Amino acid sequence: MKRLFAVFAVALLSVSPESSWRNGGESAMNGAAKFGTHDYIALKGYELAGITNLPWITSNLNVYFLGTEAPDVGPKIDGVEDGYHDTGACHCILFNAAGGVTRPRAETRVREEFNKAKQAKANGDNRKAAFYAGAMAHYLGDLSQFCHIMGPQSHWNSEDPKVHTSYEEVVDKTMDFTTHKSSLFDSFIHSVTVTGNTPEQIARGTAAFTEKGDGTERPGLMHAQYKALKEAGKQNDPGQWDAALRNQTGENVNYSANAIAKLLKMI
């Protein structure tokens, strides 16, 4: 019985309790970055910020993309301390029904990575600055995913893990890994006003945008609609999604990309 319990405990520990937007697979150490949803959101943030304003990223764009993987799989460049691969700690900001924050974890991580990027850039180490900026973009990107606004400490309660994983897999399939375009998101990307003047405020505002659903589809509604699509076998084609679900998915990602752009210009 003790042996069985030990095996069961190990199995539980080996399962990640939370998913994230995809990165197109795991890149090799110091290799060319694979491209997925996280890279797309980070790229759009970079573009919205104005490429000519960010030469320190332009000359280290591959490292910037590798940075977007770190919170899920750990750092993929030499010379960077660990402390990533932290999905179990929740890439989330959770709210109660009154709008108060009950769990600010992603807010904290955005600030930490922003500060590291700013310090590295001040030290003349643009390579590390780009990496940390990519990691920062990861946490902001996750806040555009409605399941990252759900959890036992939120008024929505926990999401269905199968819905969480399926939604992210379907979205990632809209990415063209060669052209870096998305058949789902491209039409939604445009400049919008982002609230807040500090990393913490900007991260919280990004989560609040997803939480409030821009006045339409809130996390609980998006979860219920996607779950119904999944049960009907219609989840794999965003063209078959309810227009409100599809549009809110795009608007959430667009706001996140704009939040990244604002912070990149502040580094």
Predicted regions and their residues:
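Sec-dependent N-terminal signal peptides
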Residues: 4-12
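C-terminal segment of classical bacterial N-terminal signal peptides
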Residues: 14-18
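N-terminal, motif-rich segments that launch catalysis or mediate targeting to/interaction with membranes
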Residues: 19-131, 146-267
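Short alpha-helix carrying the canonical HExxH Zn2+-binding catalytic motif
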Residues: 129-141
